[in-house]
Amino acid sequence: IDQNGADILRLWVVSSDYYSDLRIGPEIIKRMTDNYRRFRNTLRYLLGALDGYSDMEAVDYDTMPQLEKWILNQLAELDVKIRAMTEEYDFHGIFTELHSLCNSDLSAFYFEIRKDTLYCDAVDSVERRACRTVMKQLFDRLTAWLAPILCFTAEEAWQNWVGDSENSVHLRSYDPIPSNWKNNSIAVRWDGIRRVRQVVMSALENARNDGKIGASLQAAPIVHV
């Protein structure tokens, strides 16, 4: 605990199959530290992207681009799972779902796509405002979902946002998800887009390994579907 902090130990517990014998050692703790950084870096990225955000900037759901609607659909589906797993005290399942969200859906996909929108679009553009609206929803829900697992980290992130020690993340409940966030047609469409993207990314990686390109931006893929 002195070296890595209590949240690393808590993360080790929830990431383990506690129906079997638990193993711990330097390599396992190192792996937990890497997992922890994924959560912490996600929260830190969201806080940075939301600098100066206010509710006046928020965009209605119907005005949002489809990518933002897909993220909200992901949150709606995840909310159902997490509520059910919380009732069963299945914190291992919650850890698995949240790590997949932060690693696959956000870091490797949504954040990667929307960084140009955040950095380059006009501050009052609909796309940028929609992106920050969704990121605020991500931050609110991630801090609440992570609070039982990474209690100190979630509180630190939440206090960085609210700046009120009396308003603890541990006094919050899971906010209800608006019914219109669940959108099966958008989910199917973007699942297909992600599969195509994975094929393209694999081809780009092969081209880099063969020395044909140095960076992805040097390529001009042609996709046949």
Predicted feature residues:
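Short helix-adjacent coil turns
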Residues: 86-93
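Conserved structural-core and active-site-/substrate-pathway-adjacent residues in large, well-folded domains
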Residues: 5, 39, 105-106, 146, ...
